[in-house]
């Protein structure tokens, strides 16, 4: 799969047309209709041009993923996912908005690097009855520093956390209503932290 590389460049660096697609593989084990464990991996080669060295280079990224969902009781279900890798920002929710698949290397002029990053979430869903359920989820996305990054912008994003609680009611086969509360935190490399709250409501009619 050819995927657009999200990057942070400068006047000395630019992203080329990619020479190779991203290669992904996965395997899944199911032990009933609503429970499974899935493992996945991805490798990607990202090509860029250096005006300093007047040549093209490639940086290799990789990612590992594990996810699961399973019943604890007849009404209670657990779910979660864990991702770790380098240069996979475009595949991770919060990080996909930051253009950090590949970034300039402050310690090597005219070169770019892939940074370690992770993202995970875990949650529970409780089915009050066949038409009503409530759920809660916690998630974390984190970008790690290497080779002095981000020396020019310490206010850059380092970590984001979300806590979500919601409830949904399938009023009929056509009508669903729901409400959700979300609290989010952002921490920068400078350790500055901000937070926000959001309340969402949903009415959906299918026909």
Located regions from the model:
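Short, small-residue-biased leader/transition segments that mark boundaries at the very start
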Residues: 1-6
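Flexible, glycine/proline-enriched loop segments at strand-loop-helix junctions
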Residues: 10-16
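Residues that define the transmembrane beta-barrel architecture of outer-membrane proteins
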Residues: 19-23, 58-64, 114-118, 158-163, ...
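Outer-membrane beta-barrel architecture
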Residues: 26-28, 65-67, 123, 166, ...
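Detector for outer-membrane/organellar transmembrane beta-barrel domains
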Residues: 30-153, 157
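Outer-membrane beta-barrel "beta-signal"
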Residues: 70, 169-171, 195-207
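Conserved active-site loop/cleft motifs that coordinate metal ions or position small ligands
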Residues: 134-137, 166-182
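A glycine-biased, small/acidic residue-tolerant capping/turn segment at secondary-structure junctions
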Residues: 147-149, 178-179, 189-195
């Amino acid at each position: 799969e050819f995927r657009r590389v999200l990057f942070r460049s400068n006047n000395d660096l630019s992203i080329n047309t990619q020479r190779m697609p991203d290669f992904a593989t996965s395997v899944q084990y199911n032990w009933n209709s609503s429970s499974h464990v899935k493992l996945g991996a991805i490798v990607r080669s990202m090509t860029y041009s250096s005006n300093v060295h007047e040549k093209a280079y490639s940086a290799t990224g990789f990612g590992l993923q594990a996810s699961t969902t399973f019943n604890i009781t007849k009404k209670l279900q657990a779910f979660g996912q864990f991702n770790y890798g380098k240069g996979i920002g475009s595949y991770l929710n919060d990080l996909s908005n930051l253009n950090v698949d590949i970034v300039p290397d402050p310690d090597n002029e005219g070169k770019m690097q892939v940074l370690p990053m992770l993202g995970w979430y875990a949650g529970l869903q409780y089915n009050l009855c066949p038409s009503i359920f409530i759920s809660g989820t916690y998630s974390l996305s984190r970008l790690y520093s290497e080779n002095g990054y981000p020396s020019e912008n310490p206010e850059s994003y380092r970590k984001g956390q979300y806590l979500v609680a919601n409830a949904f009611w399938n009023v009929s086969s056509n009508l669903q209503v729901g409400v959700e509360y979300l609290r989010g935190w952002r921490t920068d490399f400078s350790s500055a932290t901000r937070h926000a709250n959001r309340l969402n409501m949903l009415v959906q009619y299918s026909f």
